């Protein structure tokens, strides 16, 4: 099957971030080009998640904004555990045993390394799947959904918890990295945020 050798960068933030844990050159070609965007997006979202996690220090891991909120470390743990469940139970990818998921020393950099390490084998797994696999309906908790739906639900779930952590960063008075565009802390030449009616009306 053919690929997309001349495609644009995965995201305009990715193109200015030169320290991506998963470089674009390591992303495999999808067996079905229609689903290349899913493989690209998964790699890009892992990179974005790592960039948010990296803004925390080890001293922040026990911090929470409210007694009923999760701590920073609880959210990092949940990401690793729940992503393994989505991929292993619902999408059928080969995954490590649950007892092997969490890093041994528990520092922020160790969590980031584990996030990227676990994501790596999922990329060729996703890239190898044919259309029938993506469209097949399988059990998902107490309902049934097609695998493409489950995959995108996983992406949204990760984005939800990543957004929680960007709020934590702001409350801790830390810089908030760019995710899908410039922030109050990160800007670059050529960035064009949509904060005006003029920008919203561009064609």
Language-model region placement:
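His/Met- and acidic-residue-enriched segments that coordinate or traffic transition-metal cofactors
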Residues: 53
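Short, contiguous alpha-helical
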Residues: 17-25, 39-43, 47-50, 60-101, ...
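Short, positively charged and aromatic/hydrophobic N-terminal segments
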Residues: 11-12
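Acidic catalytic patch
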Residues: 126-141
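Hydrophobic packing residues in well-ordered alpha-helices of helical domains and bundles
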Residues: 38, 42, 108-119, 151-154
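Helix-adjacent hinge/juxtasegments
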Residues: 88-129
């Amino acid at each position: 099957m053919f690929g997309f050798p001349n495609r644009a960068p995965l995201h305009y933030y990715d193109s200015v971030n030169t320290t991506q844990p998963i470089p674009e050159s390591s992303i495999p070609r999808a067996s079905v080009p229609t689903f290349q965007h899913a493989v690209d997006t998964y790699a890009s979202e892992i990179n974005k998640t790592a960039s948010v996690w990296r803004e925390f220090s080890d001293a922040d891991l026990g911090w929470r904004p409210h007694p009923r909120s999760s701590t920073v470390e609880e959210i990092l743990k949940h990401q690793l555990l729940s992503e393994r469940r989505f991929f292993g139970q619902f999408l059928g990818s080969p995954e490590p045993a649950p007892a092997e998921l969490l890093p041994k020393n528990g520092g922020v950099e160790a969590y980031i390394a584990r996030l990227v390490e676990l994501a790596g084998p999922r990329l060729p797994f996703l890239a190898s799947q044919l259309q029938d696999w993506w469209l097949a309906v399988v059990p998902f908790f107490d309902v049934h959904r097609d695998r493409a739906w489950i995959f995108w639900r996983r992406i949204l779930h990760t984005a939800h918890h990543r957004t929680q952590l960007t709020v934590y960063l702001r409350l801790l008075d830390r810089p908030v990295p760019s995710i899908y565009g410039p922030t109050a802390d990160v800007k670059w030449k050529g960035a064009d945020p949509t904060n005006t009616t003029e920008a919203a009306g561009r064609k």
